[in-house]
A protein has these predicted regions:
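Acidic, Mg2+-coordinating active-site environments of NTP-dependent enzymes
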Residues: 1-141, 166-167, 192-195, 199-201, ...
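Short glycine-rich anion-binding loops that position phosphate/pyrophosphate groups of nucleotides
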Residues: 7-9, 43-45, 148-149, 176-177, ...
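Glycine/threonine-rich flexible loop motifs
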Residues: 12-18, 154, 180-185, 250-251
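Amphipathic, non-transmembrane alpha-helical secondary structure
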Residues: 25, 29, 155-162, 188, ...
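ATP-dependent carboxylate/acyl-activation modules
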Residues: 129-131, 246, 250-251
Length: 256
């Protein structure tokens, strides 16, 4: 078994981050009870602590030489990583995708898949379904990451987009769902983060974002946004589109 991370997702159902950690850790509890094998990120202190005394594990790390070493070489914009045997250049944007790639390498290694095959498979993968997609559309360079969103993934996407070279950057952010009583607080945290970044325009879409304190342009519904886009052509440049599945912000592409 493998757990990717313990983040701020599904807070409504789990009652907070501690509930997320407890719920996801039940996978570890089950595997340990049955003496099964666990793959893990040895650079994650939560995973490392929970598995410290369990022998049936195989981890990757950029720091700890007791585990299989995998380093992030860069994400400008695509993730490039170095294993003990190869350098892998992916078609996945953002350093936040490094752990996904590293886990794929680790599991492949455990099952004795040749590194050349692991490298070729990861390098050939092109993201689809609104997940970390790069789209060149007319005069726009678009980062489409509208499959889903939570505070951690939204923060990571924004930091990556902010660090891309060039100017004329426009951001569309849709509501994050399943945050329960933390919804407005977490949306305000995102707005505060964006306020310190260098974007030409920021458009917020959804009931939660409209309740935040900011000077950004807000739309309570997608229909309000689409009406705006019909009458206001965006300048040539880079666009980030990020939101939860229920917001379906990929529809923005129809108005460009």
């Amino acid at each position: 078994g493998y757990i990717t991370n313990f983040g701020k997702a599904h807070l409504e159902g789990f009652g907070g981050v501690e509930g997320v950690i407890k719920g996801k850790s039940e996978l570890y509890d089950h595997l340990i009870a049955d003496k099964k094998f666990i793959f893990f990120n040895a650079d994650d202190p939560i995973q490392l602590k929970k598995l410290s005394s369990y022998p049936g594990k195989f981890g990757y790390s950029s720091l700890d030489t007791k585990n299989y070493k995998i380093d992030l070489l860069g994400a400008h914009p695509f993730v490039k990583l170095e294993t003990e045997e190869a350098i892998i250049s992916t078609q996945l944007i953002g350093s936040y995708n490094f752990t996904n790639c590293a886990a794929a390498v680790l599991i492949g290694k455990y099952f004795n898949i040749p590194m050349e095959d692991i490298k070729n498979a990861i390098e050939a993968y092109v993201p689809q379904n609104n997940r970390s997609q790069i789209i060149d559309k007319k005069e726009y360079y678009i980062v489409l990451d509208a499959y889903n969103a939570n505070p951690n993934s939204m923060e990571a996407a924004l930091e990556h987009f902010n660090n891309l070279p060039g100017n004329a950057k426009v951001v569309f952010l849709g509501d994050m769902f399943e945050l329960g009583e933390k919804a407005i607080e977490e949306h305000q945290n995102i707005v505060d983060l964006v306020s310190g970044m260098n974007f030409d325009k920021v458009y917020l879409v959804g009931q939660n974002f409209t309740k935040t304190r900011s000077n950004f342009t807000k739309f309570a519904t997608f229909e309000e946004l689409s009406g705006f886009l019909k009458n206001n052509k965006l300048k040539k440049g880079k666009l980030l589109i990020k939101g939860s599945r229920g917001m379906a912000l990929e529809r923005i592409l129809d108005y460009l």
